[in-house]
Structure formats: structure tokens, C-alpha cells
């Protein structure tokens, strides 16, 4: 496995692989890897080569968010990549990614102003800008992203289409802890009491899925049922609960096919997200 920190060296390695007609699966991460990331790596191994990038992107954090405290453990991450058959770990620093007079950004007029985008101003501009750069540097064939960041997946798919990137975005299922909590690098922030309270988030998701399966169409009733579960936990403060069209992120009144049910909530000071998808509904 190659551990590369230089953009120039990463581009040269990719160029060599491409000259031998090798396909590339790419997993973008901010590090502090967990089983959710490793499931993406496993999916990426259908390609000839697998690249994992580790970069805590300052551009996608707001002024009062957790950039400085975001969990980091490079040595552990590199070992996990090595143990799981990754071919290249790319770890650039911010000085390389954003040169002194950096002034070019990728932004979007729609989709990014809903859900997390409405709450985290500038977040998706940071995400799109850094991923556009990574796509140019690493030239992947398929990019593997987790459904837990569902809005991000849709935003990036739109960027790929709009800017004619020659790659495919593959969305992979949410990976959960045994008790149901969606795996997240930020779970490490939770105290024992907060960790217990956080289960209300996944419980609200599972209840909503059950209601949809039982035929409930009224989104206001589903949202209220989710709200009731979350409000029972004193440590939880709801950021949003929404049911939206998965492609447009527009709110809907009645359940149909291709709907995203999404929750964001603060457990203590930690903001967690979770969601479910309604697909294949007849």
C-alpha cells in the first residue's frame, strides 16, 4: 500500500494505473475510520485499485463547528486501510489543497439550501469544492459514498452531472452499531448518558420506516411520531425532521417512491444525522 501526501505524486501514481487500463474505486473520508468507511472500501474493491483520501476539510466547517476538535488518528487509519486491502492512502495537507491565493469555489443554487445546507451555511460549497479537486487529482471511475450523508450524496451527484465529471457516484447503505445507532466518527464525542439517549434518533427512523411499510402516507403524521420519540429524551435537541423528494430535497406531503426521511439532532453538543430511503414503492 502506498501512503502519499503529495498531489503531484498521487497524480503520477494514478496516471501509471490508468496507462495499464486499471479501474479506480475512491472513498473520500475525513479520517477516524470506522466500519461504515470500511464497508465503502469493501464495495470499492470491485475495482482494480482502491484509493482512500483522508482530509479534514476546513472549508466545510462553519466558524462555531468542530474543525479543531474533530477526531484524528492517522496511524490507526493507515493501519485499517492496510488491513483492508487499500492500494493508496492519500493524505494531503490544507496548504497543498488550498494555495495562498485560493479563490475558486464550486457552489450550487438548489438542493444545498435544504436540510443540512440550511443549518450549516457554506458547508456544501466546501464539500463540492474539495471533492471537485479530489476528482481531478485522483481521476476515479467510481466514488463510494455512504447513505448516512444522503443529502451530500445527492449534491455531489448533481455536481458530477453538471460539470461532466467522467465518474459514477455509488451510494452504499448505512452501517449501524448493534443497538441501531448509525456509525459516525462523531459518536466518540458522546458521554455514556448521551450515547444511551442518542438511540432515540435511530428509533425514530425505524418507527418511520415501519409506518411507511404499514401504509401511512401522511408525512405530517410520520414526522409527529418521530418527534414524539425524540422529545422524550431530555438530552436531545431536534435540529430538523423532514420528509423530502430524494432528488430535489423538496418537502412532500404524501409518501411516494424515492423519498428521503432525514433527522438531525444535537445530543448534548454533538450533532448527529440519520435517515431512511423509501424506494421501490408501488
Swiss-Prot record:
(R)-pantoate binds at residues 60, 152. InterPro entries: Cyt_trans-like (IPR004821), Pantoate_ligase (IPR003721), Pantoate_ligase_C (IPR042176), Rossmann-like_a/b/a_fold (IPR014729). Its EC number is 6.3.2.1. GO terms for biological process: pantothenate biosynthetic process. Its main location: cytoplasm. Pathway: Cofactor biosynthesis; (R)-pantothenate biosynthesis; (R)-pantothenate from (R)-pantoate and beta-alanine: step 1/1. Pfam families: Pantoate_ligase (PF02569). It catalyses: (R)-pantoate + beta-alanine + ATP = (R)-pantothenate + AMP + diphosphate + H(+). It is found in: Cytoplasm. Transmembrane segments: none annotated. The active site is at residue 37. GO terms for cellular component: cytosol. Coiled coil: none annotated. Beta-alanine binds at residue 60. ATP binds at residues 30-37, 146-149, 175, 183-186. Belongs to the pantothenate synthetase family. Catalyzes the condensation of pantoate with beta-alanine in an ATP-dependent reaction via a pantoyl-adenylate intermediate. Homodimer. The reaction proceeds by a bi uni uni bi ping pong mechanism. This is Pantothenate synthetase. It comes from Campylobacter jejuni (strain RM1221).
Amino acid at each position: 500500500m502506498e501512503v502519499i501526501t503529495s498531489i503531484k505524486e498521487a497524480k503520477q501514481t494514478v496516471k501509471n494505473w490508468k496507462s495499464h487500463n486499471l479501474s479506480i474505486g475512491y472513498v473520500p473520508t475525513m479520517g477516524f475510520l470506522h466500519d461504515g468507511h470500511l464497508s465503502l472500501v469493501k464495495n470499492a474493491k470491485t475495482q482494480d485499485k482502491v484509493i482512500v483520501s483522508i482530509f479534514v476539510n476546513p472549508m466545510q466547517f462553519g466558524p462555531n463547528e468542530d474543525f479543531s476538535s474533530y477526531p484524528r488518528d492517522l496511524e490507526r487509519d493507515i493501519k485499517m486501510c492496510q488491513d483492508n486491502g487499500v492500494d493508496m492512502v492519500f493524505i494531503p495537507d490544507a496548504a497543498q489543497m488550498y494555495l495562498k491565493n485560493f479563490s475558486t469555489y464550486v457552489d450550487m443554487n438548489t438542493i444545498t439550501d435544504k436540510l443540512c445546507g440550511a443549518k450549516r451555511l457554506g458547508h456544501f460549497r466546501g464539500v463540492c469544492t474539495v471533492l471537485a479537486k479530489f476528482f481531478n487529482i485522483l481521476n476515479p471511475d467510481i466514488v463510494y459514498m455512504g447513505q448516512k450523508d444522503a443529502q451530500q450524496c445527492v449534491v455531489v451527484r448533481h455536481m458530477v452531472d453538471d460539470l461532466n465529471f467522467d465518474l459514477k457516484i455509488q451510494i452504499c447503505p448505512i452501517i449501524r452499531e448493534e443497538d441501531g445507532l448509525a456509525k459516525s466518527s462523531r459518536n466518540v464525542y458522546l458521554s455514556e448518558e448521551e450515547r444511551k439517549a442518542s438511540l432515540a434518533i435511530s428509533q425514530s427512523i425505524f418507527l418511520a420506516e415501519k409506518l411507511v411499510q404499514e401504509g401511512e402516507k401522511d408525512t405530517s403524521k410520520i414526522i409527529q411520531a418521530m418527534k414524539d420519540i425524540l422529545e422524550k429524551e431530555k438530552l436531545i435537541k431536534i435540529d430538523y425532521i423532514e420528509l423530502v423528494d430524494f432528488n430535489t430535497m423538496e418537502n412532500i406531503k404524501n409518501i411516494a417512491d424515492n423519498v428521503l426521511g432525514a433527522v438531525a439532532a444535537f445530543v448534548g453538543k454533538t450533532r448527529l444525522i440519520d435517515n431512511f430511503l423509501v424506494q421501490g414503492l408501488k
